Amino acid sequence: MAKTSLKVKAARPQKFKVRAYNRCKLCGRPRAYMRKFGLCRHCFRKLAHEGQIPGIRKASW
């Protein structure tokens, strides 16, 4: 889990645009971020299995 200070730091508007980076809205993880949902892969998978994200289904072919 990300430290609270890092979450707050990422949420503040940056002085320069290139310094901004994405973090998961739930856990604050900076890696494996999915822009479309605003979540990291761990939180996305958890919420998808619980049915909390509308329109998401497990792939089967």
Swiss-Prot record:
Cofactor list: Zn(2+)
Superkingdom per UniProt: Bacteria
InterPro entries on file: Ribosomal_uS14 (IPR001209), Ribosomal_uS14_bact (IPR023053), Ribosomal_uS14_CS (IPR018271), Ribosomal_uS14_sf (IPR043140)
A molecular function (GO) term: structural constituent of ribosome
Protein keywords: Metal-binding, Ribonucleoprotein, Ribosomal protein, RNA-binding, rRNA-binding, Zinc
The UniProt record lists the keyword Ribonucleoprotein: yes
PROSITE patterns: RIBOSOMAL_S14
GO CC annotations, alphabetized: cytoplasm; small ribosomal subunit
Biological processes, Gene Ontology terms: translation
Residue positions binding Zn(2+): 24, 27, 40, 43
Cofactor binding note of this UniProt entry: Binds 1 zinc ion per subunit.
Keyword Heme in record: no
Similarity section: Belongs to the universal ribosomal protein uS14 family. Zinc-binding uS14 subfamily.
Function as written in the Swiss-Prot or TrEMBL entry: Binds 16S rRNA, required for the assembly of 30S particles and may also be responsible for determining the conformation of the 16S rRNA at the A site.
The protein's assembly and partners: Part of the 30S ribosomal subunit. Contacts proteins S3 and S10.
Protein name: Small ribosomal subunit protein uS14
